[in-house]
Amino acid sequence: MDENVLVKNLLPCVKEAGSKIIDIYNSKPNAEQKYDGSPVTIADKAAEKIIIKKIKSLCPSIPIVSEENPESHNLKSLSEFFLVDPLDGTKEFLKFDGKGSFTVNIALIRENEPLIGIVYAPAIKRLFYAGKTFGSFEENKDGIKKIRIRKSDKNKILAVASSSHLDQKTKDWLVKNNIARTVSIGSSLKFCLVASGEADVYPRFGPTME
């Protein structure tokens, strides 16, 4: 399936998953603990169900590696697969602070390279999507616009940092590079702020899950 067509077919289900997450968010659910000790809620599971069903209907032959399905993590040597995190930023989700820095994420990976990527922050209604062949876009209340990274002024560099993984190595790097301006935010929104030209760099030295 053409990448652009695939993204257009996936966007409605991403929004549906986001709506389900917000419905559950408003009820302030309790968290359970995953196999790795990290939190998981019924919102993670409900969003995953919506996304997996849609992907299987569109591309039944392509395997799906999902954050909430540990068995899928054992799939090895895949040349092509969907990578899904139905609720990235569960810790931010569970703060119920109204900031909304949690996201729904889908990517299609082929030969270790992303072909498409979708990130949706339902609480603030910002939707980002990109494809290797058609560029990067944001959809929000004002419509759809093409996005791009910005040209950095070395004296005004803005770093975006993790709200839950800001370690000493990152702090030292910021000092070493004379970066005094930072914004702290959770989830994959950090990448989106760089991609849309709202920030310049996202330093990450800690472990990163696939």
Labelled PLM ranges:
Residues 1-87, 110, 168, 172-175, ...:
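N-terminal subdomain of lithium-sensitive/metallo-dependent phosphomonoesterases centered on the IMPase/IPPase/PAP
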